[in-house]
């Protein structure tokens, strides 16, 4: 039975960059655990701020954090008060100087994590899983997606036997490395247990098509 490789991990170093941009030898484990603490803290603190990606860079005793969000106003706060409080709390958490950069997500309907979160929250609010997926697909295609695929797994409608059901529209070329495919998975806590939500969104090609540079042809 064929299994799918993680679409983002497969493209790292080709069209995707790392979310953690630092190098360490002896301090590797320490920095890795610190990254996990930072990500967990931000995800909890900004749970309602539509946060997608958190990028972490390190230089000497300084940590630069880029937060990609669809609601920058909620993260920044009035006069920058919220982001300043967040910076102070992260300074305390890490013991290092923290700089926070807020990046606005212009089209949240093309971000797999935010789409997945939206479907998961709807499932928790007892919206039918087929309806939640189809609405998300329609919004993504209207926003300019070339293709989208969704899948919900678990005890659908409270069935005794867990199963998976998914929908797709357009094309999602998982094997094409130059294809900009965003992928995310989320969990929905329902009265019947957890449901898993997976989302793949194809946003178009990034690298230009390869030119024919062959020499000495006919």
From Swiss-Prot:
- Report keywords, A-Z: Ribonucleoprotein, Ribosomal protein, RNA-binding, rRNA-binding
Every copy of the KH type-2 domain together lies at 38-106
Signal peptide interval: none
Statement: the UniProt record of this protein carries the keyword Metal-binding? no
Q: Which SUPFAM superfamilies match?
A: Prokaryotic type KH domain (KH-domain type II), Ribosomal protein S3 C-terminal domain
Q: Which GO terms describe its molecular function?
A: mRNA binding; rRNA binding; structural constituent of ribosome
A GO cellular component annotated for this chain's UniProt record is: cytosolic small ribosomal subunit
Highest taxon of source: Bacteria
Q: What InterPro entries does UniProt report for this protein, alphabetically?
A: KH_dom (IPR004087), KH_dom-like_a/b (IPR015946), KH_dom_type_2 (IPR004044), KH_sf_prok-type (IPR009019), Ribosomal_S3_C_sf (IPR036419), Ribosomal_uS3_bac-typ (IPR005704), Ribosomal_uS3_C (IPR001351), Ribosomal_uS3_CS (IPR018280)
| GO terms under biological process | translation
The disulfide bonds in this chain are none
Give yes or no: UniProt keyword RNA-binding: yes
Q: How does it assemble?
A: Part of the 30S ribosomal subunit. Forms a tight complex with proteins S10 and S14.
Q: What does this protein do?
A: Binds the lower part of the 30S subunit head. Binds mRNA in the 70S ribosome, positioning it for translation.
Query: Which family is annotated?
Result: Belongs to the universal ribosomal protein uS3 family.
Put simply, this protein is called Small ribosomal subunit protein uS3
